[in-house]
Amino acid sequence: MALPAAHAADAPDASGEVNELNRVVVSATRTERAVQDVPATVSAIDRERMDNELTRNIRDLFRYEPGIDVGGNRERFGLGDIRIRGLGGNRVRVLIDGISVSDGFSIGSFSNAGRNFVDLDTVKEVEIVRGPSSALHGSDALGGVVSFVTKDPADYLKDGAKSYFGLKLGAESQNEGIYGSATAAFAGERWSGLVVVNHHQGKETENQGDNDAHDGSRTRANPQSVEGRSLLTKLVFAPSANQRFRLTVEGSEDRTQTDVFSALGLSALTPGLPPTAPRTRVLSMYGNDHQTRARVAFAHEIDSLDSALADSLTWQVYRQDSETTQRTREQRASVVGGRDTSPTLRLREFNFDQRVYGAEAAAHKDFATGSVEHTLTYGFEYEQTEFRQKRDGRSVNLTTGAVSSTISPDAFPVRDFPISKTRNAGVFVQDEIRFADGAFRLVPAVRVDRYELKPQNDAIWNGDNPGVKISDLSKTSVSPKLGAVWHFAQDWSLYGGYQRGFRAPPYSDVNLGFTNLQFGYTAIPNPNLKPETSNGYELGLRYSGKAVYAQLSGYYNDYKDFIESNRQVSAPPQTPLIVFQSQNVDKARIRGVELRGGVDFGELDPSLAGWSGRFAAAYSKGEDKSDDRPLESIAPLTATVGVAYDREAWGVELAGRFARRKSDLPEAGRFAAPGYGVFDLLAHWNFAPGAKFNVGVFNLGDKKYWDNGDVPGALTASSAILDRYTAPGRNVGASVAVSW
C-alpha cells in the first residue's frame, strides 16, 4: 500500500485554506490520486489540521466532518463507535496502516469492548471513504472505511536532516486532562528510525448536568480517573532509492476507573407488589476498565520494478493483539421493612481478546492500449483471527462469608460465544481506465472473499451451554464496483458509480452462548446465516477553481440480510424451552446529500489575502424496511462553517457547528435532541523556529446541547436525566510543541 506523505509537525502554516479536492488520498482506489480524480466521496485529515483543531480523541477528529458521528457511553465506557452515513459498529472497517482494528462487542450492563484503540498522537493522516467499499477492502466495509496512517521517519527528516527531536505538552479543561509526547527520528545513509512516546491522563469529561445525587437521578458525569500511554517505533532500511523495508512495533494502553454513582440507589418497585415488598439497594459500584493493543509489522515497498507484471509492489506481514478487561465491584443489600439486610459484594470480570495474523500485497501496473491509458491494481489479503470472550464473577455474603459463583441469571464463568477462529482471504483487481488524456476515467473493480469460521468447545462453553452444538461456517462473497469521473469542463467534474459492500456473518451470531435451563431458554447455532450486503449508488459534482472549491453528492444505499441476534424462533420438536437464534431478517435503506467546500478570499481580492472559509453539510434519511420505521442511528441535518485568517507565523479561525432537531424517531415518546448552533475559536502561533502554540475555546456561548452519538436509544422525552447526556459547556484546550 502506498502511503501519502504528511506535513512535518513543525511545518509552517500555509496562508489560506487548502483546496481539499487537490489533496492526494489512497484508500478509495489503493493508488495515490487527488480527490477530484476519485469516483467516491473521500475526505482526509492531516497532522497539521489535527494539531490546529486540538484533536485528542475520535470525536474531536470528526468534529467538523458532517455525515460522520461517534457513539459513546456517558455512564462509564466512553467513546467506541464510528458511524458513517448512519451505519456504524463493526459495519465500518477501521484500519491502522492497513490492519483492522479490533471488533467491538458488548453484552449487558457490565461488558462493553469498544473500538477506540488508536492514539491519535501517533497518526499523521486519516482518510475516510464514505459508503460501501468492499470491492477493495473486503468484509466489514459495509458503511465505509476509516484509515489511520501512522508517522514515518521521513515525515520529520526534511532537506537532508539527519536527526529530529520534538516535545509536545498540552492540557484541556473539559476533563482536566494533561498530555505529552516525545518524538525522535534519525537518518543514516540507508537506515532511518522513529520513536514516538505519548502519555495522557485526566478525569471524567464534563457535561452540563447539575444533579450530583448518588443514585439513578444523577445528571452530572460519574467521577473517573483516566490514564493512557502509547509507543510507536519504526526502523526503515532503504537499500536503494526506490525501495524500503520497514519494521513497525506499536503498542497502546488505556485505563479508566469509574465511580458509577448513577447506578446506585434503591431499585424500582415491581408493579403490582405492595410498598413493603423486598427491594434491592446498590450501595457502591466501581468500574476498572483496561484495554491494550500491540502490533508488529514488517513491510516492503518497491517503487520501481522492471517487470511485465508490475511497476510497483508493496507487501506486509503482521501480528496484532487487542485485549479488553473490565472489572466491576458492586456492594448491595436487600431492603426489608425499610432496613438494609444481607449485605452482598458482587465481583464481575469481562474479557474480550482478539489476536490476528495477516499478510497483504498490492501491485500496480501502468500500460496503454492505443490512446487509452490503464493503471491496473491487484493484490490479496489474508487474516487469521482468534476471538476469546469470557464473563466471570462471584457473590460474597458479607454477613456469613458464603461465596457463590451464581449472579442471576448467570452461573459463572460463561462464554457468550465459543472460542472462535476465523480465516479471511480476499483477492482483488481494479483497472483505472483513462480516456481523452484523463478527461474521462472509468474504474471497474471486483473482489472475491472467502470467510471460514471454526469454533472450539471447551469446559466453560460446555458447562454454560449443555447439549448445545456449535457449527462451522464457510461463505464466499463477490463484491464488484464501477466508478467514473468526467472532467467535462475546466475546473468542473462529475463523478459517481455503484459499489457493493458486505459483512461476513459474525462469529458471535453463528454460535450463541444464550442458554439457561433454570429460566427455560436456550440458543441454537445458525450455520446458514448469510452475509449482510449493501448496494450503494452515488452521483456527485465537483468544482475546483483557484479561489473556490466545492463538492455536492447524493447517495442511495440499500442494505439487506441484516442479522438480528437472539431472535426467538420456533422450538424443535420435544424441546420444552424457549429457543433463540440469530437470523437474517432486516432490510434498510439510507439516502442522503452531502456538501462541502472552501473559499480563498485572497484569490478573489488581493486585499483579503490570508482570509479563507470552509463549509460542509450532510443530510441523511433512513428506514428499516422490515417494519417501515425510521433508523435510529441516522444523525439529523448537520453543518459546519469556518472563517479563518492566516499569516506566515500565526492564524485564527472561528468555526461553527450546527445540527437540526432530530425528528425521525422509531417510536413515539422518544427524546428528540433539539437543534443547536455552537461556535469554537481556534488559534495557532509559530512563535519561534520549530516552536508552535495552539489554543482553542470550544462552545464559546456555553450552550447546552446534545450530541447525537451520546443519546441512548431508549431515552424518553419525559426522562428526568436528559442532562446526563449533554455535551461539555465552554471549555479550553491548549498545546505547545518544540522541535530541533
What are these regions (language model features)?
Residues P12, G16-G160, S262, L539:
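Acidic, small-polar-rich N-terminal luminal/periplasmic segments of exported/outer-membrane proteins
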Residues G104, F502, Y555, K560-D561, ...:
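C-terminal beta-signal and adjacent terminal beta-strands/loops
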Residues F110-S111, G166-L169, G216-A221, T280-N288, ...:
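Extracellular loop and loop/strand-boundary signature of outer-membrane beta-barrel proteins
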Residues T150, L169-N175, G188-R190, H199-K203, ...:
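Transmembrane beta-strands of outer-membrane beta-barrel pores
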Residues A154, K162-G166, E172, Y179, ...:
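Periplasmic-side early beta-strands and strand-to-turn transitions of outer-membrane beta-barrels
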Residues A238, N242-S252, Q291-I460, K469, ...:
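Face-selective signature of the C-terminal outer-membrane beta-barrel domain
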Residues L273-L305, D416-T422, I470-S479, G483, ...:
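Outer-membrane beta-barrel signature, preferentially recognizing the C-terminal barrel domain
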Residues A363-K365, T377, F435-A436, L442, ...:
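Gram-negative outer-membrane beta-barrel transporters
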